[in-house]
Design a protein with these regions (language model features):
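Basic-flanked hydrophobic alpha-helices used for secretion and membrane insertion
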Residues: 1-265
């Protein structure tokens, strides 16, 4: 994810402090009115640069975890699959806004390329690690995606861009400890739970826009734990993990198992 990996310098913070780099904000702030073509071209160009640079082959079932969190305003928010940039209508935009990625199973290989800054690598299907592009920096996209900023701010930026308005962002960079990042609460939702059978019409209704229903599902959903924070070491040339949040293949298997038990597949 280029919007996560372009943040690579360690300036401005030391120790276990992680400072937010406002890459998204500055990119949007530099887009002229009605200049969507330039913005989309920029992202498409950079996407092409990195998509061929993935050196680790992994097999995927094309299954994505449905993940919710409560953001800083206490609003229950879907953070994966990401809906940021969906209004642009481009698959490459989605690739750039996607924060959650399945990691390779070979932990010993990852240990050679990454430093564990806090916590540990996942040992169970419901455990994840935050992958920083460098030990003391975090992209504002990841900050928004983890609910550490009000997600409506980013949505409003995107709406302004789409409406041809200039974006004015006046946020000061945030600073976090590794513990702050590991304390983010995530919930795994079974997609079929977002549907409820309507006996009158004999159909399953999608209730994902019903806030009361979503709250009930969220409250009863299983928790995902962020058990570690990692960053590439100086000798890392493989970049086998994308910056963002990495989860084990066992989570994918768990999701498939849940789907197989559901009445709706």
């Amino acid at each position: 994810n280029m919007l996560l990996t372009m943040v690579s310098d360690d300036s401005g913070s030391e120790g276990d402090k992680v400072i937010e780099k406002q890459y998204i904000s500055s990119m949007f702030g530099n887009v002229k009115s009605n200049d969507l073509k330039t913005l989309k071209g920029y992202i498409d160009k950079n996407y092409d640069l990195i998509k061929n640079d993935v050196s680790t082959i992994k097999y995927s079932y094309n299954v994505e975890p449905l993940i919710y969190t409560k953001d800083v305003t206490n609003k229950i928010t879907k953070i994966n699959p990401s809906e940021f940039f969906s209004s642009f209508g481009a698959s490459s935009m989605y690739s750039f806004s996607s924060v959650f990625n399945q990691m390779i199973d070979d932990i010993s290989s990852l240990e050679k390329d990454y430093n564990v800054l806090a916590g540990s690598w996942p040992k169970n299907y419901n455990e994840m690690v935050i992958v920083l592009s460098s030990k003391n920096t975090i992209s504002d996209l990841l900050v928004y995606s983890l609910g550490l900023r009000d997600s409506s701010e980013l949505n409003n930026m995107i709406k302004d861009i789409m409406a041809g308005k200039e974006v004015n962002i006046k946020n000061d960079p945030m600073e976090f400890t590794y513990e702050d990042l590991m304390n983010v609460k995530l919930k795994l939702v079974n997609p079929s739970d977002m549907y409820k059978y309507n006996s009158k019409f004999k159909v399953y209704e999608d209730l994902s826009e019903d806030s009361d229903y979503v709250k009930k599902i969220y409250d009863n959903a299983e928790e995902l734990k962020i058990v570690g924070v990692v960053a590439p070491n100086s000798s890392n040339s493989s970049m086998s993990l994308m910056a963002g949040v990495a989860y084990p293949s066992s989570l994918t298997k768990h999701i498939i198992d849940l789907a197989s038990e559901s009445e709706i597949v």
